[in-house]
Amino acid sequence: MSTGVKPFGFARGAHGLHATIVSICGPYARDKNIERMPSADLRPSAEPPHPNALIAIDHVTFGYDASRTILSDVSLTFQRGKVTSILGGSGCGKTTLLRLIGGVHAASKGCVRFDGEVVDTRNKEQLYRQRRRMGMLFQFGALFTDLSVFENVAFPLREQTDLSESMIRDIVLMKLNAVGLRGAAQLRISEVSGGMARRIALARAIALDPEVIMYDEPFAGLDLISMGVAANLIRTLNDVTGATSLVVSHDVPECMAISDHVILLAEQGRIVAQGTPDALMNSTDLEVRQFVRGEPDGPVKFHYPARSMAEDFGVRV
């Protein structure tokens, strides 16, 4: 039986709709000590700088336009089989990192390596081959609202493989069972809750058994029970499949509970700290403490930079 895999990129289908079923992920190794600076000084090379590194961000600079730099000279490595959370304020480049790993954007300077190969947006054949090994859970699910739960999960299997319908059926039901929704297979997307929709999107993201799963804000907009379910699924799927998981989130407690390694970013991708969850939670560094404890003022100021009160209100001192 042929299982020929088609290039994995922008999938076309489902009544003319387009879906990006790309996926990525990468975690960090467990370290006993918190690091205040980037953990690796990566230089261009044919192989990853660490024997177990699956993804390497190598002195990457990127901006969506010339007027604003999102990431500036960022270097990171992600090891196989771990859950790594990337935390930080809005606009610090967390989601942009995922897009660079998946080849959605190309770095202005530096490079991204996946399993030793440069992620080159110009080399479509190689990029599709790399993306075939990645899975992505989007923040808003990107589900087809006019299809059933079953057909949403089956979509990448139909688009990217030549599997028989009976095999597709079995795979879809197994993936839905893994996220606790096998019984919801025939429901329409309009009939499911937000938390269920997130789990359906996860089942679709793992339909092709990716080596890397990238989660973009997987806890956003979920109630406490759904949030706990999502966190448990991320950790369990990682442990059962041996995948590498990369979680971008603002939710500190959930990420600390499921991660092997945590990276805290600031403006332009500056690495504030990285280490085990315990190391960051017990850090005495003021910037780290402010973020993990949610303190309103500290190194990250409450007030946006402005002229003095005397200047704005015409008060003479």
Regions found by a protein language model. Give the residues of each.
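ABC ATPase NBD coupling module
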Residues: V119-G135, E165, L280-S283
